[in-house]
């Protein structure tokens, strides 16, 4: 799994600051550009990037937001869920906020789905006028295309494959071997996420550059 990097004191409170920012903007209709900005802010201030492989330390980031991560058996069409409040603290060793990942996911799939579920906490819980502190919250990550899932997908894309770094490594891969299969495999291993996710990121960046 991820190598943990210690934060400098200057950045230790970035997570609490982001939480406060989102609470102050409850009810805001976030654009996908807003989501990108939040993902970039987290990456910039937390310095939560593995220096050897440069993959985002998404487990570390999630835990810094005070969310514990567990694995459980679930139905195959559910990738995970997030639970806050209710009996969560009693069931999960004193943790009031947990993300549960389907234990049939591989490690790279876990990274993508963890990032998406973290976005549920940030934008569907903290940023919602319908949620109050410590109120029970539960949401499943299913294979459906609700508005929050568009936001979740945007957040995962930006935090796991930062655009500048992604373009840089795409160019590195192409110089080594410009065959499509090689580029996909190179980037998938570099960022430690599934090739399907890489395909979409490449297509998105190429479309925006035309």
Regions found by a protein language model. Name each.
Residues 1-210:
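Active-site hotspot residues in diverse enzymes, especially metal/ion-binding acidic/histidine motifs
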């Amino acid at each position: 799994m991820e190598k943990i990097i210690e934060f400098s004191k200057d950045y230790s409170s970035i997570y609490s600051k982001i939480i406060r920012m989102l609470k102050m903007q409850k009810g805001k209709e976030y654009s996908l550009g807003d989501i990108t900005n939040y993902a970039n802010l987290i990456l910039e201030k937390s310095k939560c990037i593995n220096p050897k492989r440069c993959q985002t330390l998404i487990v570390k980031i999630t835990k810094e937001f005070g969310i514990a991560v567990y694995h459980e058996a679930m139905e195959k069409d559910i990738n995970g869920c997030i639970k806050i409040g209710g009996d969560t603290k009693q069931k999960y060793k004193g943790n009031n906020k947990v993300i549960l990942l389907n234990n049939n996911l591989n490690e790279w799939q876990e990274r993508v789905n963890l990032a998406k579920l973290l976005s549920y906490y940030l934008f569907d819980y903290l940023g919602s006028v319908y949620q109050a502190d410590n109120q029970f919250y539960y949401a499943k990550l299913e294979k459906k295309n609700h508005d929050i899932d568009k936001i979740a997908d945007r957040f995962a894309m930006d935090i796991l494959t930062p655009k500048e770094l992604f373009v840089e490594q795409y160019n590195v891969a192409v110089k080594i071997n410009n065959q499509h299969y090689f580029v996909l495999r190179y980037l998938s291993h570099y960022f430690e996420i599934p090739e399907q996710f890489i395909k979409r990121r490449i297509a998105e960046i190429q479309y925006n550059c035309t």
